[in-house]
C-alpha cells in the first residue's frame, strides 16, 4: 500500500513531448478522445443506448503494428472500440525505464485513427491514482515466477490498473497480446476471479521478418543488438520442435538455455510451462500443450518472447 500511496503524488507526463502537466491534457487530436472517467463513460453510454457492443484495447502507447492488430481484432468482435494510452508507474520497479519509456500520443492517435479506433482514452496519473488512493490487487497463480522473479511488483501493478481500466470502460471484450503471455493469463485470472463480466481475447504476436516480436522497447536496441535479437524466437521454435520430436522437457530446455546464454548478454529464464496455467511440468516427455517462455538481455534492453509447444 505504501508503494501505491506514493503513486498518488505523481504528476503525469504529457505523452507528446515529456513535459509535465496537471489535470486534463490540452492536446489537439483528430480522433475522439477522453481524459476523464466521466467523459469516457458519457461516450460509451451513448453507444450502449444505440445497442452497440464495446471492445477495449489497453496500451502504454508507443504503438506499433502489434497494437494495431489488437485494435483490428477488437473491431472484428465489437461495434465500437476504445483504446487507452497510459504509462502505468505501478508496474515499473525502481531503476526501470518509467521516465524513459517512449511517449508519442499525437503519433499514436494518428495510428489509431487510421486503424478506425472509435475513441482513445488518455487518463492521467491523477485520474488513475488520485490523492488518497489506497488499494492494490495482489495476484498469485499464473503471476508467480517467470516475470515476477525479476519484477516482483509487476503483476500487482498490472492487475490493479487493468481492473480500474476495465471498470472504467466496462467493455464486452478486451484484447491482449500473446506476446506478453504470462500477463494474458494473469488478466484472464483477474477477470474470472473478480467476475468482471468481460471476455478476454488473445491476439497473436506480430513479428519482424526475422521473428523478433514487435515491442515498444525494441527502439532501445542498437544496430548490432537488433541483428542478434531475432535469435530468441528461433531458439524457442527449435525447442518446440525438439519437444514435438520426443526430446524430454529437461533436454529441450537445457539446449534452449545454452543457446540463449551463447547468443545474448544475459538470461533471466527459459521455461517450459503448462499452456493453460503456467504450472511447472514434469521433466520427462511433454504430455500436454505447453508454452515456452524466455527473457533475455541485450545490453540494457530486456526481451521476452514465447511460443506454443505440443506433445509428440
Which positions does each model-derived feature cover?
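Conserved active-site loop/cleft motifs that coordinate metal ions or position small ligands
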Residues: 268-272, 292-295
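A structural signal for short secondary-structure junctions
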Residues: 263, 286-288
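Short, basic/aromatic-enriched C-terminal tail that caps enzymatic domains
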Residues: 279-281, 290-312
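A conserved acidic, glycine/proline-rich C-terminal tail/linker
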Residues: 269-285
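Nucleotidyltransferase catalytic core that binds NTPs
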Residues: 21, 27-265, 273-277, 300, ...
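N-terminal hydrophobic alpha-helix used for membrane targeting or insertion
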Residues: 2-6, 53, 294
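N-terminal amphipathic/basic-hydrophobic helices that include classical n-h-c signal peptides
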Residues: 1-25
Amino acid at each position: 500500500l505504501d508503494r501505491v500511496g506514493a503513486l498518488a503524488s505523481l504528476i503525469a507526463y504529457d505523452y507528446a513531448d515529456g513535459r509535465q502537466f496537471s489535470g486534463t491534457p490540452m492536446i489537439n487530436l483528430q480522433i475522439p478522445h477522453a481524459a476523464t472517467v466521466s467523459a469516457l463513460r458519457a461516450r460509451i453510454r451513448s453507444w450502449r443506448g444505440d445497442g452497440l457492443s464495446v471492445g477495449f484495447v489497453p496500451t502504454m502507447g508507443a504503438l506499433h503494428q502489434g497494437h494495431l492488430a489488437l485494435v483490428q481484432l477488437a473491431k472484428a468482435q465489437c461495434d465500437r472500440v476504445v483504446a487507452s494510452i497510459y504509462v502505468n508507474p505501478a508496474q515499473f520497479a525502481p531503476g526501470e525505464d518509467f521516465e524513459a519509456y517512449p511517449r508519442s500520443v499525437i503519433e499514436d492517435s494518428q495510428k489509431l485513427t487510421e486503424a478506425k479506433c472509435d475513441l482513445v482514452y488518455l487518463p492521467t496519473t491523477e485520474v488513475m491514482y488520485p490523492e488518497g488512493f489506497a488499494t492494490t490487487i495482489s495476484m498469485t497463480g499464473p503471476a508467480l515466477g517467470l516475470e515476477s522473479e525479476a519484477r516482483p511488483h509487476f503483476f500487482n501493478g498490472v492487475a490493479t490498473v487493468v481492473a480500474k481500466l476495465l471498470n472504467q470502460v466496462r467493455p464486452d471484450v478486451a484484447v491482449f497480446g500473446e506476446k506478453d503471455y504470462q500477463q494474458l493469463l494473469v488478466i484472464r485470472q483477474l477477470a474470472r476471479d473478480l467476475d468482471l463480466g468481460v471476455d478476454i481475447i488473445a491476439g497473436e504476436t506480430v513479428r519482424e521478418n526475422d521473428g523478433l516480436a514487435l515491442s515498444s522497447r525494441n527502439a532501445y536496441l542498437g544496430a548490432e543488438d537488433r541483428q542478434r535479437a531475432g535469435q530468441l524466437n528461433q531458439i524457442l521454435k527449435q525447442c518446440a520442435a525438439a519437444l514435438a520430436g520426443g526430446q524430454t522437457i529437461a533436454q529441450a530446455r537445457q539446449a534452449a538455455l545454452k543457446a540463449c546464454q551463447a547468443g545474448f548478454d544475459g538470461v533471466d529464464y527459459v521455461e517450459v510451462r503448462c499452456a493453460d496455467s503456467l504450472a511447472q511440468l514434469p521433466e520427462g516427455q511433454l504430455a500436454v500443450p505447453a508454452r515456452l517462455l524466455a527473457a533475455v538481455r541485450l545490453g540494457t534492453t530486456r526481451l521476452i518472447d514465447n511460443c506454443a509447444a505440443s506433445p509428440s
